[in-house]
């Protein structure tokens, strides 16, 4: 089958710039003709000196895209000359500068057929220029072309169809075709994979469509039928929904597509992954007058099913706008990608420190692989809320609203939110383990660094079961390999914040605490600096600071590197070497053994209390070096195999991470499921 780009006119950023440049040159040419005509009439009424001045002013007008700088109150009775640039007020000069900047940006709103009401809404939201995917698709949609649009996640694909569809319905070619009045059939149908995404796309249609008198509703499972049926019965212009509920409403005869002008498939690749293939094909096939319907397909990736859909249901003259193409880099380039080794049991203690180090005080989303682990982890983290498919839709909407408004700053979610969330100011993404599919990593990490912002994506991984290299290779990202934040480093950062907070306290408290402070200073035997350090620690919530493993992130452990002067071909060799100079019980107590990438040694964790025993023992062993690791060396990765999920699925009968016969096998991530202890996935065996 030929590729989409071969069957249609592919559009690139370079061709768009050329078109914009040609349009700009044409406008300049037209302006010159008009200006010459005006200049001719003026010359008949002016002296030679004023004619010279008019000629100079005409050149300045041309450079400024004919921005009208006249001020009628400043004109003389017998002159129509423009005010000279030297006489401009600062306010006018600023307007002139902004106009020049706007003219230089090919994606400026002024370069597109956007009506004033919509332009006003965009400007009110701080949008003065379209994103590349929006700019490159706008004219095609307005002109009635079927279209396939592909861009990296977080690059504004939603507005790429919302804006031109709304403009077309009220001012464009479909204006006279759109139905009106009570009970009208919808003109637009948007299909997408999740309820969360439906809610957000609806919100965009309500903002932009509402500004020009259009109405919209969303239909999805988990919400009552009667309210959705009521909306459709009253009549709407735009319907946004998930395939399952749209199919149900079509079969009930409540949703009718007889007046459809636009059909949109948003996140088409995700609908494939979620098993909506049959439903999507059935819905698309329900449209009879296909020649009158414009079809738009947007996707971050183009798997074979998406290509087949575009061939079957889009017109042969369709356009393709591909901002990814064959580029290797598919993950967001505005995101800092970090990987940190961490065992499952260490996550609840480590994640808060990761948020402190990389969250910058903003919103954070934590992704887990199961619903159970999302709920359990949210319960262990202060100020966090879970979001997954088992939560009632009304509660999910309340949760999302609270997250957007800053009522709480940490969301723990399953993949249900990976494509559905479109919140521009998420600062940090944490993935508790490498996802099974590389595309999942791309979409999860793409929840930050959106709409021109930057962000951080941290992925935790077990060094013994890692697919980091595979994700790095296939997504095109370059991971920063970092160790778990050490409690002492986190405490230093928190201490700076606590010190700044102390300076904000009113001096009125000093008399009340001064006597106690002086007594403490005179009797404690500590210096003033030491006492103040302890006070800052208390204010920051610290009573002590523990060591943390660089290998697994577990508190109370330290990571060692073993070098025996010969290659390590298996983990068992590390135990053999250790038993030469340590009691068997001590050797067997080590945790998280992993070989270095060059097989020259092995790293593992030991309890802090046993550190001295290990180091002294190694000093008395010939040909053995044992050192405390300051930074992890590159480690050997082991490919994960599909049967790792055992007979119990992702957690087996025990649930969570691990489980009897499931999870990572026999409680590999701990016991019988859940978080902690013998019954918890985040507990040790």
UniProtKB/Swiss-Prot annotation:
Gene: RH7
E.C. number: 3.6.4.13
Species name: Spinacia oleracea (Spinach)
SMART domains per record: DEXDc, HELICc
Listed Pfam families: DEAD, GUCT, Helicase_C
Domain notes: The Q motif is unique to and characteristic of the DEAD box family of RNA helicases and controls ATP binding and hydrolysis.
Subcellular location: Nucleus
Protein name: DEAD-box ATP-dependent RNA helicase 7
Motif Q motif: chain residues: 107-135
UniProt-listed SUPFAM superfamilies: P-loop containing nucleoside triphosphate hydrolases, RNA-binding domain, RBD
GO CC terms of this entry: nucleolus
Coiled coil as UniProt keyword: no
One Gene Ontology molecular-function label: ATP hydrolysis activity
Residue ranges of the region described as Disordered: 1-89
């Amino acid at each position: 089958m030929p590729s989409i780009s071969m069957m249609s006119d592919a559009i690139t950023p370079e061709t768009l710039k050329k078109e914009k440049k040609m349009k700009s040159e044409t406008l300049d040419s037209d302006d010159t003709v008009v200006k010459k005509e005006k200049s001719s009439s003026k010359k008949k009424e002016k002296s030679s000196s004023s004619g010279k001045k008019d000629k100079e002013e005409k050149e300045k007008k041309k450079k400024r895209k004919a921005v009208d700088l006249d001020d009628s109150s400043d004109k003389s009775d017998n002159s129509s000359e423009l005010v000279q640039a030297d006489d401009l007020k600062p306010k006018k000069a600023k307007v002139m500068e902004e106009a020049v900047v706007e003219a230089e940006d090919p994606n400026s709103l002024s370069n597109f057929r956007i009506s004033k009401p919509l332009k006003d809404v965009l400007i009110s939201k701080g949008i003065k220029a379209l994103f590349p995917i929006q700019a490159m698709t706008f004219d095609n949609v307005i002109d009635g072309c079927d279209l396939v649009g592909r861009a990296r996640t977080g690059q504004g694909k939603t507005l790429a169809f919302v804006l031109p569809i709304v403009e077309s319905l009220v001012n464009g070619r479909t204006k006279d075709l759109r139905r009106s009045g009570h009970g009208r059939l919808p003109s637009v149908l948007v299909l997408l994979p999740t309820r969360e995404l439906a809610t957000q796309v609806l919100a965009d249609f309500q903002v932009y469509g509402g500004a020009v008198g259009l109405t919209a509703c969303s239909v999805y499972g988990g919400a009552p039928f009667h309210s959705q049926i009521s909306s459709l019965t009253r009549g709407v212009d735009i319907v946004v929904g998930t395939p399952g509920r749209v199919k149900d409403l079509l079969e009930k005869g409540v949703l009718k597509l007889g007046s459809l002008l636009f059909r949109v498939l948003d996140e088409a690749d995700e609908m494939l992954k979620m098993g909506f293939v049959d439903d999507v094909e059935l819905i698309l096939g329900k449209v009879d007058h296909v020649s009158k319907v414009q079809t738009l397909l947007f996707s971050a990736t183009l798997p074979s099913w998406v290509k087949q859909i575009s061939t079957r249901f889009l017109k042969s003259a369709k356009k393709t706008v591909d901002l990814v193409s064959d580029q290797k880099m598919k993950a967001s380039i505005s995101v800092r990608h970090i990987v940190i080794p961490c065992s499952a049991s260490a996550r609840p203690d480590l994640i808060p420190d990761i948020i402190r180090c990389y969250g910058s005080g903003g919103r954070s989303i934590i992704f887990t692989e199961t619903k159970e682990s999302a709920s359990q982890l949210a319960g262990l983290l202060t100020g966090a809320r879970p979001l997954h498919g088992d939560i009632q839709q009304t509660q999910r909407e309340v949760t999302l609203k609270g997250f957007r408004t800053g009522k709480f700053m940490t969301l723990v979610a399953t993949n249900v939110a990976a494509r559905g969330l479109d919140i521009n100011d998420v600062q940090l993404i944490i993935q508790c383990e490498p996802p099974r599919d590389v595309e999942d990593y791309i979409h999860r990490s793409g929840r930050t660094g959106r709409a021109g912002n930057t962000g951080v994506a941290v992925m935790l991984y077990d060094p013994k079961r890692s697919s980091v290299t595979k994700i790095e290779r296939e997504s095109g990202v370059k991971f920063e390999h970092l160790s778990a934040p050490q409690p002492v480093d986190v405490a230093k950062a928190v201490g700076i914040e606590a010190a700044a907070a102390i300076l904000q306290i009113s001096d009125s408290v000093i008399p009340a605490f001064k006597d106690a402070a002086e007594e403490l200073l005179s009797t404690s035997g500590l210096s003033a600096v030491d006492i103040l350090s302890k006070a800052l620690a208390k204010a920051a919530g610290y009573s002590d600071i523990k060591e943390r493993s660089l290998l697994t992130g577990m508190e109370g452990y330290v990571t060692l590197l073993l070098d025996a002067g010969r290659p390590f071909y298996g983990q068992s060799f590390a135990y053999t070497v250790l038993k030469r100079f340590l009691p068997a019980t001590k050797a067997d107590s080590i945790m998280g053994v992993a070989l270095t990438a060059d097989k020259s040694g092995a790293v593992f964790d030991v309890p802090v209390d046993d550190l001295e025993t290990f180091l002294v023992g190694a000093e008395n062993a010939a040909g053995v070096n044992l050192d405390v690791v300051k930074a992890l060396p590159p480690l050997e990765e082991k490919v994960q195999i599909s049967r790792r999920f055992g007979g119990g699925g992702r957690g087996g009968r025990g649930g969570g991470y691990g489980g009897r016969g499931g999870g990572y096998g026999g409680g590999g991530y701990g016991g019988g499921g859940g978080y902690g202890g013998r019954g918890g996935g985040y507990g040790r065996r």
